[in-house]
Protein backbone atom coordinates (compact mmCIF):
# COMPACT_ATOMS: atom_id res chain seq x y z
CA UNK A 1 0.00 0.00 0.00
CA UNK A 2 2.92 2.34 0.69
CA UNK A 3 3.78 2.36 -3.04
CA UNK A 4 0.54 4.25 -3.72
CA UNK A 5 1.46 7.17 -1.48
CA UNK A 6 3.90 8.86 -3.91
CA UNK A 7 1.39 8.40 -6.75
CA UNK A 8 -1.38 9.87 -4.61
CA UNK A 9 0.77 12.87 -3.73
CA UNK A 10 1.66 13.35 -7.40
CA UNK A 11 -2.04 13.20 -8.34
CA UNK A 12 -2.88 15.78 -5.68
CA UNK A 13 -0.13 18.07 -7.02
CA UNK A 14 -1.40 17.71 -10.59
CA UNK A 15 -4.95 18.52 -9.47
CA UNK A 16 -3.65 21.53 -7.54
CA UNK A 17 -1.74 22.85 -10.53
CA UNK A 18 -4.67 22.23 -12.86
CA UNK A 19 -6.92 24.16 -10.53
CA UNK A 20 -4.63 27.17 -10.72
CA UNK A 21 -4.11 27.06 -14.49
CA UNK A 22 -4.98 30.21 -16.48
CA UNK A 23 -5.53 32.23 -13.33
CA UNK A 24 -5.23 36.00 -13.06
CA UNK A 25 -5.44 38.47 -10.18
CA UNK A 26 -5.50 42.23 -9.74
CA UNK A 27 -2.71 43.19 -7.35
CA UNK A 28 -3.34 46.34 -5.32
CA UNK A 29 -0.53 46.09 -2.78
CA UNK A 30 3.05 44.81 -2.95
CA UNK A 31 5.43 44.16 -0.06
CA UNK A 32 8.06 46.87 0.04
CA UNK A 33 5.82 49.55 -1.48
CA UNK A 34 4.10 52.00 0.84
CA UNK A 35 0.36 52.22 0.27
CA UNK A 36 -1.74 51.02 -2.68
CA UNK A 37 -0.09 50.78 -6.10
CA UNK A 38 -0.66 53.95 -8.17
CA UNK A 39 -1.27 51.86 -11.30
CA UNK A 40 -3.23 48.73 -12.17
CA UNK A 41 -1.18 45.53 -11.98
CA UNK A 42 -2.42 42.09 -12.96
CA UNK A 43 -0.45 38.86 -12.61
CA UNK A 44 -1.36 35.40 -13.74
CA UNK A 45 -0.68 32.28 -15.74
CA UNK A 46 -1.69 31.26 -19.25
CA UNK A 47 -1.31 27.60 -20.22
CA UNK A 48 0.29 26.85 -23.60
CA UNK A 49 1.50 23.77 -25.42
CA UNK A 50 0.11 20.27 -25.32
CA UNK A 51 -2.67 20.14 -22.72
CA UNK A 52 -1.50 23.57 -21.52
CA UNK A 53 1.46 21.91 -19.82
CA UNK A 54 3.57 25.08 -19.90
CA UNK A 55 2.21 27.69 -17.49
CA UNK A 56 3.50 31.11 -18.54
CA UNK A 57 3.62 33.74 -15.81
CA UNK A 58 3.05 37.38 -16.68
CA UNK A 59 2.80 40.84 -15.17
CA UNK A 60 0.37 43.16 -16.95
CA UNK A 61 0.30 46.90 -16.28
CA UNK A 62 -2.33 49.16 -17.78
CA UNK A 63 -1.36 52.40 -19.48
CA UNK A 64 -1.56 55.42 -17.22
CA UNK A 65 -2.91 57.51 -20.13
CA UNK A 66 -5.67 55.81 -22.11
CA UNK A 67 -5.57 52.01 -21.79
CA UNK A 68 -8.52 51.60 -24.17
CA UNK A 69 -6.62 53.03 -27.14
CA UNK A 70 -2.92 53.11 -26.19
CA UNK A 71 -0.65 50.45 -27.74
CA UNK A 72 -0.30 47.01 -26.17
CA UNK A 73 3.37 46.08 -25.81
CA UNK A 74 4.78 42.64 -25.03
CA UNK A 75 8.15 43.05 -23.31
CA UNK A 76 10.69 40.22 -23.02
CA UNK A 77 14.03 40.14 -21.24
CA UNK A 78 17.18 38.48 -22.52
CA UNK A 79 19.24 35.56 -21.38
CA UNK A 80 17.68 33.31 -22.44
CA UNK A 81 16.33 32.67 -18.97
CA UNK A 82 16.02 36.22 -17.61
CA UNK A 83 12.70 37.07 -15.98
CA UNK A 84 10.70 39.91 -17.51
CA UNK A 85 10.59 41.31 -13.98
CA UNK A 86 14.01 42.67 -14.99
CA UNK A 87 12.33 45.01 -17.45
CA UNK A 88 9.52 45.93 -15.08
CA UNK A 89 11.71 46.80 -12.10
CA UNK A 90 14.96 48.04 -13.68
CA UNK A 91 14.31 49.29 -17.19
CA UNK A 92 10.92 50.62 -18.27
CA UNK A 93 8.34 49.88 -15.57
CA UNK A 94 6.63 52.09 -12.97
CA UNK A 95 8.51 50.58 -10.00
CA UNK A 96 12.15 50.38 -8.98
CA UNK A 97 14.16 49.42 -5.93
CA UNK A 98 15.52 51.99 -3.54
CA UNK A 99 19.25 51.33 -3.67
CA UNK A 100 20.43 50.81 -0.11
CA UNK A 101 22.37 48.19 1.82
CA UNK A 102 20.31 45.05 2.33
CA UNK A 103 19.45 44.61 6.01
CA UNK A 104 17.46 41.37 5.84
CA UNK A 105 14.05 43.00 5.42
CA UNK A 106 12.04 43.27 2.21
CA UNK A 107 13.77 45.69 -0.21
CA UNK A 108 11.94 48.99 -0.62
CA UNK A 109 10.04 49.72 -3.83
CA UNK A 110 9.62 53.26 -5.15
CA UNK A 111 7.80 54.83 -8.10
CA UNK A 112 9.77 55.77 -11.22
CA UNK A 113 9.41 58.76 -13.55
CA UNK A 114 10.44 57.04 -16.80
CA UNK A 115 7.91 54.21 -17.11
CA UNK A 116 6.80 53.28 -20.61
CA UNK A 117 3.40 52.50 -19.09
CA UNK A 118 2.71 56.23 -19.22
CA UNK A 119 1.89 55.70 -22.92
CA UNK A 120 1.43 51.94 -23.35
CA UNK A 121 -0.17 48.86 -21.81
CA UNK A 122 2.65 46.39 -21.15
CA UNK A 123 2.70 42.61 -20.71
CA UNK A 124 5.94 41.45 -19.08
CA UNK A 125 6.23 37.73 -19.87
CA UNK A 126 8.50 35.16 -18.22
CA UNK A 127 9.72 33.00 -21.11
CA UNK A 128 10.94 30.44 -22.07
CA UNK A 129 9.26 28.06 -19.65
CA UNK A 130 11.42 27.68 -16.55
CA UNK A 131 12.19 31.40 -16.49
CA UNK A 132 11.06 33.46 -13.50
CA UNK A 133 7.76 32.07 -12.21
CA UNK A 134 6.82 30.22 -15.42
CA UNK A 135 6.82 26.45 -15.03
CA UNK A 136 5.93 23.20 -16.77
CA UNK A 137 3.44 20.69 -15.39
CA UNK A 138 5.33 18.01 -17.32
CA UNK A 139 8.67 17.22 -15.64
CA UNK A 140 9.68 15.25 -18.76
CA UNK A 141 9.00 18.11 -21.17
CA UNK A 142 11.43 18.69 -24.03
CA UNK A 143 14.15 21.30 -23.67
CA UNK A 144 12.72 24.59 -24.99
CA UNK A 145 14.10 26.01 -28.22
CA UNK A 146 14.08 29.55 -29.59
CA UNK A 147 11.70 28.69 -32.42
CA UNK A 148 9.50 26.59 -30.14
CA UNK A 149 9.35 29.39 -27.58
CA UNK A 150 8.31 31.85 -30.30
CA UNK A 151 5.33 29.62 -31.09
CA UNK A 152 4.51 29.43 -27.38
CA UNK A 153 4.56 33.22 -27.11
CA UNK A 154 2.18 33.53 -30.07
CA UNK A 155 -0.15 31.02 -28.42
CA UNK A 156 0.12 32.89 -25.11
CA UNK A 157 -0.83 36.19 -26.72
CA UNK A 158 -3.91 34.87 -28.50
CA UNK A 159 -5.13 33.18 -25.33
CA UNK A 160 -4.37 36.26 -23.23
CA UNK A 161 -6.27 38.50 -25.63
CA UNK A 162 -9.19 36.08 -25.67
CA UNK A 163 -9.37 36.54 -21.89
CA UNK A 164 -8.88 40.32 -22.28
CA UNK A 165 -10.96 41.05 -25.42
CA UNK A 166 -11.00 44.78 -24.72
CA UNK A 167 -7.40 44.93 -26.04
CA UNK A 168 -8.00 43.24 -29.41
CA UNK A 169 -8.44 46.65 -31.05
CA UNK A 170 -5.27 48.17 -29.55
CA UNK A 171 -2.22 48.43 -31.83
CA UNK A 172 0.20 45.68 -30.80
CA UNK A 173 3.99 45.77 -30.60
CA UNK A 174 6.55 43.22 -29.42
CA UNK A 175 9.75 44.34 -27.74
CA UNK A 176 12.75 43.42 -25.66
CA UNK A 177 16.49 43.77 -25.38
CA UNK A 178 19.68 41.72 -25.48
CA UNK A 179 18.89 38.07 -26.39
CA UNK A 180 15.33 39.11 -27.23
CA UNK A 181 16.91 40.40 -30.44
CA UNK A 182 16.89 36.77 -31.54
CA UNK A 183 13.36 36.08 -30.30
CA UNK A 184 11.25 39.14 -31.09
CA UNK A 185 11.67 39.17 -34.90
CA UNK A 186 10.67 35.48 -34.95
CA UNK A 187 7.70 36.14 -32.67
CA UNK A 188 6.58 38.91 -35.04
CA UNK A 189 6.65 36.36 -37.88
CA UNK A 190 4.69 33.82 -35.83
CA UNK A 191 2.04 36.43 -35.05
CA UNK A 192 1.89 37.56 -38.67
CA UNK A 193 1.56 33.98 -39.91
CA UNK A 194 -1.05 33.19 -37.27
CA UNK A 195 -3.14 36.17 -38.34
CA UNK A 196 -3.48 34.52 -41.75
CA UNK A 197 -5.03 31.35 -40.30
CA UNK A 198 -8.81 31.36 -40.41
CA UNK A 199 -10.45 31.11 -37.01
CA UNK A 200 -7.48 32.33 -34.98
CA UNK A 201 -7.98 35.42 -32.81
CA UNK A 202 -6.46 38.35 -34.71
CA UNK A 203 -3.67 40.43 -33.22
CA UNK A 204 -3.42 44.00 -34.51
CA UNK A 205 0.32 43.73 -35.11
CA UNK A 206 2.07 47.00 -35.98
CA UNK A 207 5.76 46.44 -35.34
CA UNK A 208 8.51 45.86 -32.81
CA UNK A 209 11.16 47.59 -30.73
CA UNK A 210 14.58 46.23 -29.73
CA UNK A 211 17.30 47.59 -27.47
CA UNK A 212 20.95 46.54 -27.99
CA UNK A 213 19.70 43.37 -29.70
CA UNK A 214 21.66 40.15 -30.04
CA UNK A 215 21.11 39.41 -33.73
CA UNK A 216 23.83 37.28 -35.29
CA UNK A 217 26.41 35.58 -33.08
CA UNK A 218 29.36 35.90 -35.47
CA UNK A 219 28.58 39.47 -36.47
CA UNK A 220 27.91 40.67 -32.91
CA UNK A 221 31.10 39.16 -31.52
CA UNK A 222 33.34 40.22 -34.41
CA UNK A 223 32.13 43.81 -34.18
CA UNK A 224 33.61 44.13 -30.69
CA UNK A 225 37.08 44.55 -32.16
CA UNK A 226 35.99 47.44 -34.37
CA UNK A 227 34.15 48.97 -31.40
CA UNK A 228 37.18 48.60 -29.11
CA UNK A 229 39.32 50.37 -31.70
CA UNK A 230 36.82 53.19 -32.09
CA UNK A 231 36.72 53.66 -28.31
CA UNK A 232 40.54 53.72 -28.08
CA UNK A 233 40.64 50.51 -26.04
CA UNK A 234 43.16 49.00 -28.47
CA UNK A 235 45.85 50.65 -30.54
CA UNK A 236 45.54 51.39 -34.23
CA UNK A 237 48.53 49.12 -34.85
CA UNK A 238 46.88 46.16 -33.10
CA UNK A 239 43.59 46.76 -34.90
CA UNK A 240 45.18 46.90 -38.35
CA UNK A 241 47.28 43.80 -37.59
CA UNK A 242 44.19 41.88 -36.46
CA UNK A 243 42.24 42.87 -39.57
CA UNK A 244 45.09 41.85 -41.85
CA UNK A 245 46.07 38.63 -40.08
CA UNK A 246 42.66 37.33 -38.96
CA UNK A 247 40.73 38.41 -42.05
CA UNK A 248 37.92 39.93 -40.00
CA UNK A 249 37.11 36.63 -38.25
CA UNK A 250 38.02 36.75 -34.58
CA UNK A 251 35.70 34.06 -33.23
CA UNK A 252 36.35 30.79 -35.03
CA UNK A 253 40.04 31.17 -35.77
CA UNK A 254 41.97 28.53 -37.66
CA UNK A 255 44.17 26.91 -34.97
CA UNK A 256 47.04 26.97 -37.48
CA UNK A 257 46.83 30.76 -37.69
CA UNK A 258 49.04 31.25 -34.65
CA UNK A 259 49.78 34.89 -35.46
CA UNK A 260 46.06 35.72 -35.29
CA UNK A 261 45.69 33.81 -32.03
CA UNK A 262 48.56 35.79 -30.50
CA UNK A 263 46.98 39.07 -31.59
CA UNK A 264 43.68 38.02 -30.00
CA UNK A 265 45.56 37.40 -26.75
CA UNK A 266 46.92 40.95 -26.97
CA UNK A 267 43.38 42.21 -27.57
CA UNK A 268 42.05 40.26 -24.56
CA UNK A 269 44.78 41.75 -22.35
CA UNK A 270 43.66 45.24 -23.37
CA UNK A 271 39.94 44.77 -22.69
CA UNK A 272 39.86 42.23 -19.85
CA UNK A 273 39.46 45.00 -17.28
CA UNK A 274 36.53 46.59 -19.12
CA UNK A 275 32.91 46.13 -18.01
CA UNK A 276 31.33 45.14 -21.32
CA UNK A 277 27.74 46.11 -20.46
CA UNK A 278 28.82 49.75 -20.18
CA UNK A 279 32.49 50.48 -20.71
CA UNK A 280 32.27 53.70 -18.68
CA UNK A 281 31.32 51.81 -15.51
CA UNK A 282 34.10 50.24 -13.41
CA UNK A 283 34.12 46.54 -12.65
CA UNK A 284 33.09 46.30 -9.02
CA UNK A 285 32.05 44.10 -6.12
CA UNK A 286 28.42 43.11 -6.76
CA UNK A 287 27.73 43.03 -3.02
CA UNK A 288 28.50 46.75 -2.62
CA UNK A 289 25.56 49.19 -2.90
CA UNK A 290 27.95 51.50 -4.76
CA UNK A 291 28.17 48.95 -7.58
CA UNK A 292 25.60 49.48 -10.35
CA UNK A 293 24.90 45.75 -10.58
CA UNK A 294 24.10 45.57 -6.85
CA UNK A 295 20.48 46.36 -7.68
CA UNK A 296 20.11 43.00 -9.42
CA UNK A 297 20.64 41.29 -6.06
CA UNK A 298 17.71 43.20 -4.54
CA UNK A 299 15.28 41.49 -6.92
CA UNK A 300 16.45 38.09 -5.69
CA UNK A 301 15.88 39.08 -2.07
CA UNK A 302 12.46 40.52 -2.94
CA UNK A 303 11.08 37.78 -5.20
CA UNK A 304 12.14 34.97 -2.86
CA UNK A 305 10.24 36.42 0.08
CA UNK A 306 7.14 34.33 0.82
CA UNK A 307 4.93 37.38 1.38
CA UNK A 308 5.91 38.65 -2.07
CA UNK A 309 5.03 35.35 -3.71
CA UNK A 310 1.67 35.35 -1.98
CA UNK A 311 1.04 38.93 -3.08
CA UNK A 312 1.90 38.08 -6.70
CA UNK A 313 -0.36 34.98 -6.53
CA UNK A 314 2.47 32.63 -7.46
CA UNK A 315 1.25 29.02 -7.31
CA UNK A 316 2.90 27.39 -4.33
CA UNK A 317 5.30 24.56 -5.08
CA UNK A 318 5.74 25.34 -8.78
CA UNK A 319 9.15 27.02 -8.65
CA UNK A 320 12.11 26.75 -6.36
CA UNK A 321 14.42 29.65 -5.69
CA UNK A 322 13.60 32.54 -8.02
CA UNK A 323 16.54 33.76 -10.10
CA UNK A 324 16.48 36.98 -12.07
CA UNK A 325 18.50 35.24 -14.77
CA UNK A 326 18.58 31.46 -14.74
CA UNK A 327 21.83 30.92 -16.61
CA UNK A 328 21.62 27.16 -16.04
CA UNK A 329 18.32 26.94 -17.93
CA UNK A 330 18.65 24.50 -20.80
CA UNK A 331 17.60 26.05 -24.09
CA UNK A 332 18.20 25.07 -27.70
CA UNK A 333 19.50 28.22 -29.39
CA UNK A 334 18.34 27.18 -32.85
CA UNK A 335 18.17 30.69 -34.31
CA UNK A 336 21.69 31.43 -35.53
CA UNK A 337 20.71 34.78 -36.96
CA UNK A 338 17.52 36.83 -36.83
CA UNK A 339 18.50 38.92 -39.88
CA UNK A 340 16.31 36.86 -42.29
CA UNK A 341 13.32 37.53 -40.00
CA UNK A 342 14.04 41.26 -40.03
CA UNK A 343 14.06 41.09 -43.83
CA UNK A 344 10.69 39.38 -43.96
CA UNK A 345 9.19 41.71 -41.36
CA UNK A 346 10.38 44.65 -43.47
CA UNK A 347 8.78 43.22 -46.61
CA UNK A 348 5.51 42.88 -44.73
CA UNK A 349 5.62 46.55 -43.75
CA UNK A 350 6.01 46.37 -39.97
CA UNK A 351 7.52 49.35 -38.15
CA UNK A 352 10.63 48.83 -36.07
CA UNK A 353 12.80 50.80 -33.68
CA UNK A 354 16.30 49.44 -33.12
CA UNK A 355 18.36 51.33 -30.57
CA UNK A 356 21.78 50.81 -29.00
CA UNK A 357 23.65 52.25 -26.07
CA UNK A 358 26.75 53.68 -27.72
CA UNK A 359 28.99 52.40 -24.90
CA UNK A 360 27.69 48.81 -24.98
CA UNK A 361 30.48 46.38 -25.85
CA UNK A 362 28.42 43.17 -25.60
CA UNK A 363 26.40 43.94 -28.74
CA UNK A 364 28.12 47.04 -30.13
CA UNK A 365 26.17 49.55 -32.18
CA UNK A 366 28.63 49.16 -35.06
CA UNK A 367 27.58 45.53 -35.50
CA UNK A 368 23.91 46.50 -35.35
CA UNK A 369 24.53 49.12 -38.04
CA UNK A 370 26.22 46.48 -40.20
CA UNK A 371 23.26 44.10 -40.26
CA UNK A 372 20.79 46.95 -40.76
CA UNK A 373 22.79 48.10 -43.81
CA UNK A 374 22.77 44.51 -45.11
CA UNK A 375 18.98 44.81 -45.54
CA UNK A 376 19.76 47.23 -48.42
CA UNK A 377 17.04 49.79 -47.79
CA UNK A 378 17.50 53.40 -48.78
CA UNK A 379 17.82 56.10 -46.13
CA UNK A 380 14.88 58.51 -45.88
CA UNK A 381 16.07 60.46 -42.82
CA UNK A 382 19.85 60.80 -42.82
CA UNK A 383 22.09 60.44 -39.78
CA UNK A 384 21.47 63.28 -37.35
CA UNK A 385 21.42 63.98 -33.61
CA UNK A 386 18.22 63.53 -31.66
CA UNK A 387 17.76 66.00 -28.86
CA UNK A 388 16.38 66.34 -25.33
CA UNK A 389 16.11 69.90 -23.98
CA UNK A 390 18.50 71.20 -26.67
CA UNK A 391 21.13 68.60 -25.75
CA UNK A 392 22.29 65.72 -27.94
CA UNK A 393 20.84 62.48 -26.54
CA UNK A 394 22.11 60.26 -29.36
CA UNK A 395 22.00 59.86 -33.12
CA UNK A 396 19.39 58.43 -35.44
CA UNK A 397 18.57 57.51 -39.02
CA UNK A 398 15.45 56.06 -40.65
CA UNK A 399 15.19 53.68 -43.59
CA UNK A 400 12.57 53.11 -46.28
CA UNK A 401 11.48 49.86 -44.63
CA UNK A 402 10.02 51.81 -41.67
CA UNK A 403 13.05 50.87 -39.56
CA UNK A 404 14.48 53.56 -37.31
CA UNK A 405 17.91 53.13 -35.77
CA UNK A 406 19.07 55.25 -32.85
CA UNK A 407 21.98 55.41 -30.45
CA UNK A 408 21.65 56.52 -26.84
CA UNK A 409 24.62 58.67 -25.83
CA UNK A 410 26.38 57.20 -22.82
CA UNK A 411 24.04 54.20 -22.82
CA UNK A 412 24.90 50.58 -22.16
CA UNK A 413 23.61 47.10 -22.93
CA UNK A 414 20.34 47.48 -21.02
CA UNK A 415 17.89 50.33 -20.56
CA UNK A 416 18.66 50.94 -16.89
CA UNK A 417 21.85 52.86 -17.64
CA UNK A 418 19.89 55.68 -19.34
CA UNK A 419 16.22 55.08 -18.42
CA UNK A 420 15.01 58.65 -18.96
CA UNK A 421 16.54 58.95 -22.42
CA UNK A 422 15.27 55.52 -23.45
CA UNK A 423 11.80 56.44 -22.24
CA UNK A 424 11.69 59.64 -24.30
CA UNK A 425 13.02 57.75 -27.33
CA UNK A 426 10.26 55.14 -27.05
CA UNK A 427 7.48 57.66 -26.40
CA UNK A 428 8.37 59.68 -29.49
CA UNK A 429 8.63 56.63 -31.72
CA UNK A 430 5.49 54.83 -30.52
CA UNK A 431 3.45 58.01 -31.08
CA UNK A 432 4.80 58.47 -34.61
CA UNK A 433 6.84 61.59 -33.83
CA UNK A 434 10.26 62.30 -35.28
CA UNK A 435 12.96 61.48 -32.76
Swiss-Prot record:
KW Signal (keyword) present: yes
Glycosites: 103, 305, 376
Residues of the signal peptide: 1-23
Catalytic center residues: 178, 360, 413
Chief site of localization: secreted
Keyword Ribonucleoprotein recorded: no
GO molecular function: serine-type carboxypeptidase activity
Biological processes annotated in GO: proteolysis
Localisation per UniProt entry: Secreted
Gene3D superfamilies, per the entry: alpha/beta hydrolase (3.40.50.1820)
Gene Ontology CC annotation, any one: extracellular region
Disulphide-bonded residues: 82-325, 246-260, 284-291
InterPro entries in the cross-refs: AB_hydrolase_fold, Peptidase_S10
Domain of life (superkingdom): Eukaryota
Keywords: Carboxypeptidase, Disulfide bond, Glycoprotein, Hydrolase, Protease, Secreted, Signal
Family per record: Belongs to the peptidase S10 family.
Protein name, entry field: Serine carboxypeptidase-like 16
Gene name of the record: SCPL16
